[in-house]
Amino acid sequence: MEFARINDNDLCAISVVSFPIGTAFSVPISNLSRILSAIRETYVIAGTLGQIHFQMMNNSAHICAFTYQSGPSIVKQTFRYGILQLKIISKLFSSRKYSGIVIFFMEFPPFLPMIAAKMLNNKVYWLLPSKISLLSKDMSSKLTAVLSKICYNICSKIILYSPSLVSYWNLEPYRHKILIAHEHFLDFETFTVTTPLSDRPPLIGYIGRLSSEKGVQHFARALPAILSDRENLCVLIGGNGQLRDSIAASLQEEGIAARVDLTGWISHEELPKYLNQLRLLVLPSYTEGLPNIMIEAMACGTPVLATPVGAVPDVIVDGKTGFIMEDNSPECIAENVMQVLEHPDLERVAETGRRFVEENFMFERAVERWKEVLDEI
């Protein structure tokens, strides 16, 4: 694609760079591009894992996407990842006349593209959506940590979802260059209450990636205790990921597979329908940034039970806007799920949470905050 030249007198344009991204990340990057393009000319340069539909993208954001296929071996994977970075660097060079700000929106350090963006005299920002790498201690994670430190020093600013993430992600040495902003907003005509909580079936669930950092394996292990206590209760587990087969096998072994619906991937369009069926959404994550599914559930009047990780405590105040559990052990999950389902003011908590999200996650508020961030640049 060819970028359209903006007038010399105009404010510099913004390039958003993200790679490699999967289907689940299409909403966050689409939201960010929509916010930024309401402020300035915006270009999205993305490396995608397969064909990705960028949802909710308005027409004023320009998209350039490179498809990235993970290799069958470490060597091929590294080679293909290197080629992807070279393609992104090439696009940064070709668009250098039109962009003065580059925002890298990704967890893993964009080492080479960030150096290239800096060499082109761009103001470089790193918006961190999560820090899954903190959970691993293998060699690749150690390399990621080293490259991350280099990128923290290279970039002009680091953008986080919450001040609490500074210490949680061990970023105290860079506090002087940290700004707070997020890309979260909702369409409240889509994410709304269509079925009152009292009219919903006895159904609890988890919706998200089926991977170890999400703690979904512990939720599955908690289900025998939960279901034995409530004979009419059923469970929904929505999403795909590397743990899908092992979770399905464990449900069969425990003899509860008939009461658990493993739906697979749930599209963003179908999500409100599923959320309006749940009496409780459980998020037993080890680590989070600011999970979209949390605010989407709350907007639909669905109570959320979550671990106090990332920016979750900024949104969920235990017993007021939702519920917090101490950890994600199966025993803790089971105990808290049963307590929440028996909570005498569950509908009031759900309504308070819904109002909080409606007041704090409007598109207009997100745009205003990003205007403030860009004014600091």
Language-model regions, residue ranges each:
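Aromatic "clamp/platform" in nucleotide-sugar-dependent glycosyltransferases that forms part
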Residues: 286
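An aromatic- and histidine-rich active-site surface loop
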Residues: 84-85, 101-122, 126-128
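A short, well-ordered alpha-helix in the C-terminal region of glycosyltransferases
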Residues: 332, 339, 345-360, 366-372
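N-terminal subdomain of nucleotide-sugar transferases
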Residues: 1-53
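Conserved acidic donor-binding segment of nucleotide-sugar-dependent glycosyltransferases
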Residues: 318-319, 323-330, 339-344
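A conserved mid-protein helix/loop that constitutes part of the nucleotide-sugar donor-binding site
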Residues: 26-34, 202, 206-225, 242-248, ...
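Donor nucleotide-sugar binding/catalytic pocket of nucleotide-sugar-dependent glycosyltransferases
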Residues: 46, 64, 141, 145-192, ...
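Short hydrophobic beta-strand element within catalytic cores of glycosyltransferases
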Residues: 303-306
